[in-house]
Swiss-Prot record:
One of its GO terms (molecular function) is iron ion binding. The gene is psbE. Heme binds at residue 23. Its cofactor is heme b. This is Cytochrome b559 subunit alpha. Belongs to the PsbE/PsbF family. The lineage of its organism: Eukaryota, Viridiplantae, Streptophyta, Embryophyta, Tracheophyta. With its partner (PsbF) binds heme. PSII binds additional chlorophylls, carotenoids and specific lipids. Keywords: Chloroplast, Electron transport, Heme, Iron, Membrane, Metal-binding, Photosynthesis, Photosystem II, Plastid, Thylakoid, Transmembrane, Transmembrane helix, Transport. This b-type cytochrome is tightly associated with the reaction center of photosystem II (PSII). PSII is a light-driven water:plastoquinone oxidoreductase that uses light energy to abstract electrons from H(2)O, generating O(2) and a proton gradient subsequently used for ATP formation. It consists of a core antenna complex that captures photons, and an electron transfer chain that converts photonic excitation into a charge separation. Disulfide bonds: none annotated. It comes from the Eukaryota. One of its GO terms (cellular component) is chloroplast thylakoid membrane. It is a single-pass membrane protein. Heterodimer of an alpha subunit and a beta subunit. PSII is composed of 1 copy each of membrane proteins PsbA, PsbB, PsbC, PsbD, PsbE, PsbF, PsbH, PsbI, PsbJ, PsbK, PsbL, PsbM, PsbT, PsbX, PsbY, PsbZ, Psb30/Ycf12, at least 3 peripheral proteins of the oxygen-evolving complex and a large number of cofactors. It forms dimeric complexes.
Length: 83
C-alpha cells in the first residue's frame, strides 16, 4: 500500500480560487512578455539569428549551396568571406 506524500490533490488545486487569481495574472503576463520579446526584435539580438531582411546581402542574393563533394571546404570559405 502506498503512503501519503502530504501533497494537495490536483483537483483541489485547480478548483481553488487562489489558483485562478494567481494564474489569471501570470499566464497572460507570460504571453505578453513573449510577444514583446519577439516583436521588438530582442529575440534576434539575444540568440544571434539574423533578422528577416539580413539573410541575404546586397552583393549575395543566391542561397549558399554546397555543390561539390570534394571541394566543399573551399566553397564554405568562399561563402564565409562574403560576410
Amino acid at each position: 500500500m502506498s503512503g501519503n506524500t502530504g501533497e494537495r490533490p490536483f483537483a483541489d488545486i485547480i478548483t481553488s480560487i487562489r489558483y485562478w487569481v494567481i494564474h489569471s495574472i501570470t499566464i497572460p503576463s507570460l504571453f505578453i512578455a513573449g510577444w514583446l520579446f519577439v516583436s521588438t526584435g530582442l529575440a534576434y539580438d539575444v540568440f544571434g539569428s539574423p533578422r528577416p531582411n539580413e539573410y541575404f546581402s546586397e552583393s549575395r542574393q543566391e542561397v549558399p549551396l554546397i555543390t561539390g563533394r570534394f571541394d566543399s571546404l573551399e566553397q564554405v570559405d568562399a561563402f564565409t568571406k562574403s560576410f
